[in-house]
């Protein structure tokens, strides 16, 4: 089973996680929303799969390029 790391495209804080561990997702689905410079930026899945785990919690500060979730295909 292949795993896919989902990385944040911007630094900021995790405003809301919109999916759950174990949930099946499609490419283009929003996994979470990052607040950066008073803007809400969605983290979008580039591949379909199942959410294995989140590497961050809501309200956590994150950096650009940080792994925020792991998917399995």
Residue ranges of each PLM-predicted region?
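Short beta-strand-turn/beta-hairpin segments enriched in glycine/proline and small hydrophobics
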Residues: 1-13, 30-46, 73
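Short histidine-centered loop motifs in beta-beta connectors
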Residues: 16-20, 24, 53-56
């Amino acid at each position: 089973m292949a795993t896919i790391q989902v990385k944040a495209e911007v630094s900021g804080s995790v405003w809301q996680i919109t999916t759950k561990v174990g949930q099946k997702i499609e490419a283009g689905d929003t996994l979470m929303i990052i607040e950066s410079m008073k803007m809400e930026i969605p983290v979008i899945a580039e591949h379909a799969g199942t959410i294995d785990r989140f590497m961050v919690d809501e309200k956590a500060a994150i950096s650009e390029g940080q792994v925020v979730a792991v998917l399995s295909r």
